[in-house]
A protein has these predicted regions:
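P/S/T/G-enriched low-complexity
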Residues: 1-244
């Protein structure tokens, strides 16, 4: 829940949170009412929140001059925390928890749209959490003690890391992702990485290092190779299941 202290009364809040009859991309009252043809601005509901929960940012870590801080929970008895929540109308596609619904997964993928830059580590972390549960993700189905399970993550990307929130710093992103990859593999999870390189980028050293071994990194130079690649991964996993 994100709140803007500057919007501490509902009149100011109503001017910034609502819907315009002239289009979804007109996101404040003044711009809406400036449209032609009798525009109508409808303020949002003060008792609901249409925002989204995303990964946290990467603030500067503690140091001798920047000590760690114990951030207390919001005090809901104070006036500055009682006004309506700031709304946000551009949430990305939600992550789908583990599911056997192939139709649901295909629908989710088809609804995605390419936007922004690349941060592989964010997707990798969410994939890990959806596999093991915790936080906003439900716990995975209980495992039968009579069977041995193999947990697998396939990291697919069409580009190198270029974006960390509001600034670009590839080396820092790569360093954090390398740590995530190491932790995933240390947890006994098999990690495949697939680089779709159609733009002439260098082969990703990071993705090669992230893969569980050299046979689990795939470099594709055409999107047409994706189906065959995933079929090969599926075959490898099927052979593993039969052998075990």
């Amino acid at each position: 829940r994100s709140q803007d202290p500057a919007l501490s009364d509902n009149n100011s809040w109503d001017a910034q949170n609502g819907d315009c009859s002239k289009g979804w991309n007109i996101n404040n009252r003044s711009d809406c009412l400036a449209q032609t043809g009798s525009p109508k601005w409808t303020p949002g509901n003060h008792n609901t929140w249409n925002g989204c929960v995303v990964d946290r940012g990467n603030p500067t870590g503690p140091s001798a001059l920047n000590t760690d801080t114990n951030v207390l929970a919001t005090d809901i008895t104070k006036n500055d925390t009682l006004f309506a929540a700031e709304q946000y109308g551009a949430c990305p596609q939600a992550v789908m928890p583990l599911s056997y619904s192939w139709a649901g997964m295909k629908s989710l993928v088809n609804a995605m749209s390419p936007n922004g830059n690349t941060n592989q580590g964010i997707g990798l972390a969410h994939g890990w959490m959806s596999l093991v549960g915790g936080g906003p993700y439900p716990a995975p189905p209980a495992e039968d003690p009579n069977y041995k399970y193999t947990k697998v993550i396939i990291l697919l990307t069409d580009g190198l890391n270029t974006q960390n929130r509001w600034y670009t710093d590839q080396s820092k992103i790569d360093t954090r992702q390398a740590t995530t990859c190491a932790n995933i593999k240390a947890a006994g999870i098999t990690l495949y990485t697939v680089q779709v390189n159609t733009g002439g980028d260098p082969t990703s050293t990071l993705l090669q290092q992230c893969a569980s071994d050299s046979t689990k990194f795939f470099l594709l130079t055409s999107a047409n190779q994706m189906v065959a690649t995933f079929q090969q991964i599926g075959t490898n996993l099927s052979n593993l299941r039969i052998a075990q």
